[in-house]
Amino acid sequence: KQIMTLVLQLQTPRIGTYNLSCGPEGLFILDTNEKRIDLEILQLSFDSIVHRPQYEVVSEDINNNVTPDLKKTKFSNQYLLIPQNNFVTEDVKILEICKFLKPTCDLLSINFFSQGGPHIKFQSMKLEKDEYKINISQNGITIYANDYGGRFYAIITLIHLISYYDSKLPLGEIEDRPYFVWRGMHLDCSRQFHTVKHIKRLLIYMGMFKLNRFHWHLTDNEAWRLDLNCYPNLARQSSFRGYKQLIPPLYGSGFEKSGGYYSREEVKDIIAFAKKLNIEVMPEIDLPAHSWALTQVMPELYDHASNMHSEDVGSYKNNTINPSLESTWNFLNNIIAEISDLFSFHIIHVGVDERPKSS
């Protein structure tokens, strides 16, 4: 074996300094015949160890046992006993939610489908969107809400409380509704591809903390991940990267072909899954800049006769589509029409950020 030493210099981005490193992920070396040489990367050595900050422990009270904080609680020092965290759930609207959350509840050893234990009842009440009330007494638990979101968040609050108190709940009342209309989470699936399974896992975490907007970043310089009928080759050609692929290795992807895209059926599946968690899915199609992958497949979207050579903050050259071309507007009309039909949410995010000044 031949030992090769590589000295890596940490680059400092314009938005700040990274204090951690994953090392030379994706590194590969070719011989003069462009054949890949087998590598064994030994343990990295660093000049100094990064010390992570220690954070103060938050005091333990009821509002810190449910995240986000509940708006109003009134509990006594008495408890409703719940042997083995078993509940009897009979209301159809509550059962619908509990069935969907069963895999998560199984992991937490919470059973909403027992033949014995406190009964969970539901009563409709005129409340605000996503607002709910819970009454806990020795006779059982009653949930009050006006819509699906209120019922769903009431169950989520019970899951948090049961996980904390274990086999009992304090008697009393809860009144709660979200502090903000928009409670979002962003996931960049362009720079790194995430499977449908992983996205659903993130959505479950979002639902457990009452977030209601999934900002799905589907396109950027590095890939176009959304499969569209109007341009069937776009995602299939730009969503994979690797050596001698249309999109070169990026972000540690390495020599082999890797990546993926989301079919229309997968998108519909994710949207339906998110709705059961009271989450709306907002797609982001990043334009007019951040479009390097797009322009590799559809070079007619920028003007080849122009002598302008732009470069963005990520060192991508000519990554901006040209709004003065008829082909650009035809493209925009086609994709917006199809995306609007595919996604049920009323907003499409179009980026409009970091356009190179010379573009």
Tell what function each PLM region has.
Residues 1-16:
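Intrinsically disordered, low-complexity Pro/Gly/Ser/Thr-rich segments with frequent PxxP/GP/PP motifs
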